[in-house]
């Protein structure tokens, strides 16, 4: 299981 982290602005 992989953790993904992202954001938008």
Curated annotation (Swiss-Prot):
Pyrrolidone carboxylic acid sites (modified residues): 1
Keywords: Pyrrolidone carboxylic acid
Other noteworthy facts: The biological source(s) and physiological activities of this peptide have not been determined.
Protein name: Thymic factor
Lineage, uppermost ranks: Eukaryota, Metazoa, Chordata, Craniata, Vertebrata
């Amino acid at each position: 299981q992989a953790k993904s982290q992202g954001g938008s602005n």
